[in-house]
Amino acid sequence: MDRDSLPRVPDTHGDVVDEKLFSDLYIRTSWVDAQVALDQIDKGKARGSRTAIYLRSVFQSHLETLGSSVQKHAGKVLFVAILVLSTFCVGLKSAQIHSKVHQLWIQEGGRLEAELAYTQKTIGEDESATHQLLIQTTHDPNASVLHPQALLAHLEVLVKATAVKVHLYDTEWGLRDMCNMPSTPSFEGIYYIEQILRHLIPCSIITPLDCFWEGSQLLGPESAVVIPGLNQRLLWTTLNPASVMQYMKQKMSEEKISFDFETVEQYMKRAAIGSGYMEKPCLNPLNPNCPDTAPNKNSTQPPDVGAILSGGCYGYAAKHMHWPEELIVGGAKRNRSGHLRKAQALQSVVQLMTEKEMYDQWQDNYKVHHLGWTQEKAAEVLNAWQRNFSREVEQLLRKQSRIATNYDIYVFSSAALDDILAKFSHPSALSIVIGVAVTVLYAFCTLLRWRDPVRGQSSVGVAGVLLMCFSTAAGLGLSALLGIVFNAASTQVVPFLALGLGVDHIFMLTAAYAESNRREQTKLILKKVGPSILFSACSTAGSFFAAAFIPVPALKVFCLQAAIVMCSNLAAALLVFPAMISLDLRRRTAGRADIFCCCFPVWKEQPKVAPPVLPLNNNNGRGARHPKSCNNNRVPLPAQNPLLEQRADIPGSSHSLASFSLATFAFQHYTPFLMRSWVKFLTVMGFLAALISSLYASTRLQDGLDIIDLVPKDSNEHKFLDAQTRLFGFYSMYAVTQGNFEYPTQQQLLRDYHDSFVRVPHVIKNDNGGLPDFWLLLFSEWLGNLQKIFDEEYRDGRLTKECWFPNASSDAILAYKLIVQTGHVDNPVDKELVLTNRLVNSDGIINQRAFYNYLSAWATNDVFAYGASQGKLYPEPRQYFHQPNEYDLKIPKSLPLVYAQMPFYLHGLTDTSQIKTLIGHIRDLSVKYEGFGLPNYPSGIPFIFWEQYMTLRSSLAMILACVLLAALVLVSLLLLSVWAAVLVILSVLASLAQIFGAMTLLGIKLSAIPAVILILSVGMMLCFNVLISLGFMTSVGNRQRRVQLSMQMSLGPLVHGMLTSGVAVFMLSTSPFEFVIRHFCWLLLVVLCVGACNSLLVFPILLSMVGPEAELVPLEHPDRISTPSPLPVRSSKRSGKSYVVQGSRSSRGSCQKSHHHHHKDLNDPSLTTITEEPQSWKSSNSSIQMPNDWTYQPREQRPASYAAPPPAYHKAAAQQHHQHQGPPTTPPPPFPTAYPPELQSIVVQPEVTVETTHSDSNTTKVTATANIKVELAMPGRAVRSYNFTS
């Protein structure tokens, strides 16, 4: 028999380790063929779990059938696979990519999704405001921006940027077309007064410049307003609203033009619109345009910017436009009196409409009648203007070197953020090509065989890597066809991660393929490693599916796509790659080299010449034909010396580098080193110390994923978010109240709910330490003023119970109309209420019966306060324009409210722990008042993006518990041992604890992304440990021997898989996204490192100490099974031929027919050493001859060469004679041996009787006796000769 045909442990290099002389059938029986192990138990030659081995045999039979079918139809399988994979790849053309933050990182499910759905359903949009922000910082972190030059530079940038235009749909759009500005009252009669107000009321811009006269330069208007009779072009830089109003009132009175100036005066009075910017200090007192009324006009001293900015700034309407200091100044330091002494940044906010507000604003305007105006077009106009704003700032900084030299100016808008996310969300073709090229090169180099090109695997290995790339692309295409939307997480991570994990399957298959060239190779490969690959892919895909329960859309999509790709890779590894192996077998059989097999001639290996070992009466020729003649002539052939052949391949020879293999290293060096007592002690102590330290460090693990990590690094938006988070930590939020609540009767509960936010940390207070007024307080205040005016004029006799007189004021008449409202639709007015009814009581509680009638009047006649309240009342109150000369007393009643909000400003939120504490505090308030009967919820960026952390740890713990429970069941099914599964799960738990500790040391905070990686790490750790456990369970011997055999089998695939996965993960460092680098790249590398240490170092030692019992325990030999029975022979009466079951056909042809013994399979029991007699045989004689010079040596005293696997039994030949002869004498062993004498020479004489009955009742009886002698030549392979007698 050819020595290369002996089944061996797979070697990743394809090297045949000569020291490995036991076949896998004897020492890994259930791994190679569970049916043989089952037969051993049935015959009482071994004990073990019969159920477990039976189930394993069922698995193996199915995989063997699959392998046979694939090998038989290899070309067809490849053709169909290419068609299917190509079809799925076409699906990539339909892939959609989501890049907007709110589409990707907002938690799905739970209360947050219900709250957002309620907001969307009620008011038709999720966002409450759109902002264009600008931050200015200094280059020098120690410098301050609290000086006039910094504010003037800030002004120059803002003036240029806010003046940009955008041309869309044949229309020009500017800031005034889309900015958020206060509403103006409507008038009847003289329309131009209303037009003047609309042109003068500017956009709302939150800026520190509002503390100075220069802030007026931002307000415009673009073209000066001309008032008839007033020889002045009105601009906010020269406008004194109070004096202009007095002039107009006087002028129109002189001209006897009737106009309700009282309404305008009340409008200005309630908003505290006075002198505008005329009395504010100038940044440059020497500027000739600085008004004479400025307090520092012509002053030679620069203004004290810090003192002026302390406490915040006020806009032109002081009552409703107070910009908190924390919003406009960042990185502030104060003196003892609390005044600003130093600041690092200035911030301005241009407030824009939302897309729905802009759509509603222009829906009925002539400007868009020809456009087919839609909300989508409104959004496009808004986004285009924001892009132009950012572009204008960039161009200005390039032109104005003075500003760029001293300051950093960052612009941020939601449109710019969406653009840059969309730009970088597409996969990088260069990174993918580099990753594939490196993996292909690694596979080529590790699978290349320099000394034996025929048995090399580099070509099929490279084909396997390319197949994994193909199947990965097909899996992503299938995801696109299924409607799964891509995002930055999936496009940047999935291709590399899938390639790294998929190549692991290729190395496992090539490791098994490294065995000898055999006809049924494919089915045997799948029979051995198929269960491991199936388990590995299932555990990884299962981990991804489990991680999909993390309620973050971006990660949910990532997990689903990764799971689909893993299933695609599994199908390619079990169906397509074996077909490639089947085709490569033909190359091996043809004797062609691995590389350029079509270019080089057939490779002919030079035979090794060695001194012959000629046992007495034995003829042997390795791989030679043995002519069989009737006269029993024998031709002696020279034999090879296996001992010399063995020495030619030992390390240290001239070819030691080329012949190095991880399997040999694991068996001869690595595992024996691990099994030393002091190594075990140090490893276990180090492992326990690392575990304890990790558990302690994990208690300090913080939650958090900053928004800055979601933005590509080195972008302007990334720099803005870094400065904003570090210097401001400013956010806006809203407390939303819902429907199913009686607002008129529960006003005090609403007030208490609002007042409760005073005690919430990080909420900005007003100058008095309280909170800004919300809509109900402004509503009540307006009614209170009307009630006060009515009471005064009623006492003066300007109004009576039945009517009012011409000298009554407009507000008193409006109050009269409000007082007589009953609140009933069928009887809306009752004048009797004038004497008894009050608009508000002494506590500020609004009249409950007419609450919604009053609301209609307030929303229309106090529009500045209504808009400034940011209440977003829905349904929107009905309109009622009050006219003093209108005698209809009926006021329309608004619909009951189902949505209202209270605005709050938050500051100092620089990390997730602070935001999480704030969310918890506000959520507690929400739950508390929910119990009081007020349906409510908070809204805003902190709740949208950080809500996931409130339940993240409990959700992660629950998912991990379910995954570990499922893993316990799955591992138990694969290993068929509960104790082995428990050890694997314990190892995984320890690895998780170490990963938590490593996250703390690396500063990686716990968020949804690390949660997904932690769940995935369970599947990866299972793959590492289960492969070692499987080898341990299926090996024969004591624990240390089984660990040695297990590491010999698994070290190569594990190391190669980890290295290729590491290369693929390392390629993630090229991503422009910080979250990909920190949370995917770094954390996956940590998982691989922890997995490598625990699985390759700690777990083998754990198995050697408390590992489970082997599946099969031989009863006759400690380190191998008993020799299996030969295959029964089936005879055919009709054809006169005999068949060997599961073997090759034999014929009773002529004596001259030659036989090729080297094609026999050692795994076939019929070719093994015969040590038993089946029931159909009759044993007539057997004897055992022992050499006299043998002495027993204990295992401890045997030579060091026993560290290698013990030599295998070899077949000796026997001769067949026509007459019985005595057994031949046994030659002396060629060298001393340490093995028992019964292994040296075995002689068996079975007697076979065959009876044949013919139709003529004649019976022919033939009795044949064969003397079969088996000799074992140590330590090399036996020299064989066959002697037949009959």
UniProtKB/Swiss-Prot annotation:
<feature type="topological domain" description="Extracellular">
    <location>
        <begin position="487"/>
        <end position="492"/>
    </location>
</feature>
<dbReference type="GO" id="GO:0030228">
    <property type="term" value="F:lipoprotein particle receptor activity"/>
</dbReference>
<feature type="glycosylation site" description="N-linked (GlcNAc...) asparagine">
    <location>
        <position position="335"/>
    </location>
</feature>
<feature type="topological domain" description="Cytoplasmic">
    <location>
        <begin position="1"/>
        <end position="76"/>
    </location>
</feature>
<comment type="subunit">
    <text>Interacts (via C-terminal cytoplasmic region) with CG5504/l(2)tid; the interaction is probably direct. Interacts with hh/hedgehog.</text>
</comment>
<dbReference type="InterPro" id="IPR004766">
    <property type="entry name" value="TM_rcpt_patched"/>
</dbReference>
<comment type="similarity">
    <text>Belongs to the patched family.</text>
</comment>
<feature type="transmembrane region" description="Helical">
    <location>
        <begin position="533"/>
        <end position="553"/>
    </location>
</feature>
<dbReference type="GO" id="GO:0042981">
    <property type="term" value="P:regulation of apoptotic process"/>
</dbReference>
<feature type="compositionally biased region" description="Polar residues">
    <location>
        <begin position="1141"/>
        <end position="1152"/>
    </location>
</feature>
<keyword id="KW-0675">Receptor</keyword>
<feature type="topological domain" description="Cytoplasmic">
    <location>
        <begin position="1104"/>
        <end position="1286"/>
    </location>
</feature>
<feature type="topological domain" description="Cytoplasmic">
    <location>
        <begin position="953"/>
        <end position="955"/>
    </location>
</feature>
<dbReference type="GO" id="GO:0005119">
    <property type="term" value="F:smoothened binding"/>
</dbReference>
<feature type="transmembrane region" description="Helical">
    <location>
        <begin position="956"/>
        <end position="976"/>
    </location>
</feature>
<feature type="transmembrane region" description="Helical">
    <location>
        <begin position="1008"/>
        <end position="1028"/>
    </location>
</feature>
<dbReference type="GO" id="GO:0030707">
    <property type="term" value="P:follicle cell of egg chamber development"/>
</dbReference>
<dbReference type="GO" id="GO:0055088">
    <property type="term" value="P:lipid homeostasis"/>
</dbReference>
<feature type="topological domain" description="Cytoplasmic">
    <location>
        <begin position="449"/>
        <end position="465"/>
    </location>
</feature>
<dbReference type="GO" id="GO:0005886">
    <property type="term" value="C:plasma membrane"/>
</dbReference>
<feature type="topological domain" description="Extracellular">
    <location>
        <begin position="1078"/>
        <end position="1082"/>
    </location>
</feature>
<feature type="region of interest" description="Disordered">
    <location>
        <begin position="1116"/>
        <end position="1237"/>
    </location>
</feature>
<dbReference type="GO" id="GO:2000274">
    <property type="term" value="P:regulation of epithelial cell migration, open tracheal system"/>
</dbReference>
<keyword id="KW-0472">Membrane</keyword>
<dbReference type="GO" id="GO:0097108">
    <property type="term" value="F:hedgehog family protein binding"/>
</dbReference>
<protein>
    <recommendedName>
        <fullName>Protein patched</fullName>
    </recommendedName>
</protein>
<feature type="transmembrane region" description="Helical">
    <location>
        <begin position="1057"/>
        <end position="1077"/>
    </location>
</feature>
<feature type="compositionally biased region" description="Polar residues">
    <location>
        <begin position="1165"/>
        <end position="1191"/>
    </location>
</feature>
<feature type="glycosylation site" description="N-linked (GlcNAc...) asparagine">
    <location>
        <position position="807"/>
    </location>
</feature>
<dbReference type="GO" id="GO:0048099">
    <property type="term" value="P:anterior/posterior lineage restriction, imaginal disc"/>
</dbReference>
<keyword id="KW-0217">Developmental protein</keyword>
<feature type="topological domain" description="Extracellular">
    <location>
        <begin position="93"/>
        <end position="427"/>
    </location>
</feature>
<dbReference type="GO" id="GO:0007346">
    <property type="term" value="P:regulation of mitotic cell cycle"/>
</dbReference>
<feature type="topological domain" description="Extracellular">
    <location>
        <begin position="977"/>
        <end position="1007"/>
    </location>
</feature>
<dbReference type="GO" id="GO:0001746">
    <property type="term" value="P:Bolwig's organ morphogenesis"/>
</dbReference>
<feature type="transmembrane region" description="Helical">
    <location>
        <begin position="678"/>
        <end position="699"/>
    </location>
</feature>
<dbReference type="GO" id="GO:0007411">
    <property type="term" value="P:axon guidance"/>
</dbReference>
<feature type="compositionally biased region" description="Low complexity">
    <location>
        <begin position="1199"/>
        <end position="1216"/>
    </location>
</feature>
<keyword id="KW-0812">Transmembrane</keyword>
<feature type="domain" description="SSD">
    <location>
        <begin position="428"/>
        <end position="583"/>
    </location>
</feature>
<dbReference type="GO" id="GO:0035332">
    <property type="term" value="P:positive regulation of hippo signaling"/>
</dbReference>
<dbReference type="InterPro" id="IPR053958">
    <property type="entry name" value="HMGCR/SNAP/NPC1-like_SSD"/>
</dbReference>
